[in-house]
Amino acid sequence: MIGQIKVLGKSKEEAEAEALKQLEAVGLADRADFKPGALSGGQQQRVAIARAVAMHPNVLLFDEPTSALDPELVRGVLDVMRDLAKNSGMTMIVVTHEMGFAKDVADRVVFMEGGVVVEQGTPDVIFNNPQNPRTAEFIGAIA
């Protein structure tokens, strides 16, 4: 809430209401009073997303948001991100190895290797008709 108060100039009451609204959106309103250590990794990630969204950014960056999670927790985080992509109108830049998620949610996919862009295009092109042999090799390996 401090970011909303200090940066956005909201009152404590407005910040609390926005925080609760965003926790509700990620399915964690019932955990509003919990300390981070009392939350699972997936819940912590969803709280982090709620905190970021509460600041009403135009662009939200995600760097491997599911990489440190147990497999059973990944879906909850991806569901929150999928909902944001569909309903927020916010630009999201996501670094991920979750190819199914990228294929379903992205407007544009950039395939990189060694910090270099290998190929970029629509999900249809990248996943179904890659133009670069390295992209094709990667897609073939995960199919």
Whereabouts are the PLM-identified features?
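Conserved ABC ATPase signature
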Residues: K35-L39, Q43
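Conserved catalytic motifs of ABC-family nucleotide-binding domains
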Residues: H56
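Helical segment within the ABC ATPase nucleotide-binding domain
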Residues: R75-N87
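ABC ATPase "signature
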Residues: Q120-G121
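H-loop/switch region of ABC-family ATPase nucleotide-binding domains
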Residues: T96-H97
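Catalytic Walker B motif of ABC-type/P-loop ATPase nucleotide-binding domains
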Residues: L60-D63
